[in-house]
């Protein structure tokens, strides 16, 4: 895969993709609108507090790489930006609406399960069910031209595995596995503590009963 993004570039691209679909009347976006979208509290993980200068610097880097273009008119005082991330005339990355919706949501929120993605992409595309969502994710993970997403180790106590995009580089699977193991150990320790507390409560109840009988 040729496109590699920094976390801030991923946020900017994700926002431009999202707003192109959800608010077409206000797209391309001004710098102010794009900054607001980047700092949005809903459908963002993590929530950021970027300045316009930070967003501007990121956009200029993306323009230099031809992943974003300035669509403002010649005599306009306000720049308006649109993404050229995919589906451009000469670009190699071609995505259908479902694939683009999933990639957009992964860029904006990081690792998610197929169920979460089906719900969170409802304004971007449509999936019949979770199985269809997972099938599209698997297609993105097994592209002949290079994987765009990867399936992560399943977390303890979870029914579904999460998927993560690969536009910010390879995912450290060992770190995710370690995190899952730590969560499993923590869950096991918590269960043991609960059992110990329950046993102590029984002992206290028995002692109370003995004292009451003795005093009675």
Curated annotation (Swiss-Prot):
Assigned protein family: Belongs to the UPF0502 family.
Stored Pfam families: DUF480 (PF04337)
Matches recorded under InterPro entries: DUF480 (IPR007432), WH-like_DNA-bd_sf (IPR036388), WH_DNA-bd_sf (IPR036390)
UniProt protein name: UPF0502 protein VC0395_0676/VC395_A0574
Species per Swiss-Prot/TrEMBL record: Vibrio cholerae serotype O1 (strain ATCC 39541 / Classical Ogawa 395 / O395)
